[in-house]
């Protein structure tokens, strides 16, 4: 499959995705991303949006690192986008000046409370994954940059 010019937006929860879908004109129930998951996909000529879908056992949105990784991997494989945007709601820390409704652009991304106290596994446990440098974009739009953990 040839890479596309599409942008992939990954959102965990339907309630987070709905306003984005409305704004982008991505209507309907979407399509099932794969036979092995409940993830849903909507697309137009330039944007592809996926959600993790509903957990069949508990009947709630599939949230967390495992559904996010599986959905993102499957969507990247299916779409081969030029860029992936992980968007949605997350917690913040008031002591770090976080506030409800604030947009924060990631300058680093790591696992929250995922420490492994075995020699040589400390860095692996934390993750500290690279992200695209969007500092200039954040400044231009008036958004803050900061660390994002999952």
Segments and roles (model prediction):
Residues 3-5, 34-150:
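Glycine-rich phosphate- or other oxyanion-binding loops that anchor nucleotides, phosphorylated ligands
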Residues 5-28, 43, 47, 55:
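Short, conserved "active-site rim" segments that organize catalytic pockets and cofactor/ligand binding
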């Amino acid at each position: 499959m040839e890479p596309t010019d599409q942008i992939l937006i990954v959102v965990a929860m339907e309630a987070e995705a709905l306003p984005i879908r409305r704004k982008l004109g991505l209507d309907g129930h979407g399509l099932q991303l794969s036979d092995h998951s409940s993830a849903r996909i909507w697309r137009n000529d330039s944007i592809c949006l996926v959600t993790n879908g509903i957990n069949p056992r508990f009947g709630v949105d599939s949230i967390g690192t495992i559904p996010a990784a599986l959905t993102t991997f499957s969507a990247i494989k299916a779409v081969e986008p030029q860029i992936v945007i992980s968007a949605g709601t997350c917690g913040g820390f008031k002591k770090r000046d976080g506030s409800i409704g604030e947009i924060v652009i990631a300058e680093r991304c790591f696992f929250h409370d995922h420490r492994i106290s075995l020699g040589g596994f400390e860095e692996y446990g934390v993750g500290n994954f690279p992200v695209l440098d969007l500092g200039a974009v954040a400044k231009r739009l008036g958004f803050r940059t900061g660390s994002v953990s999952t």
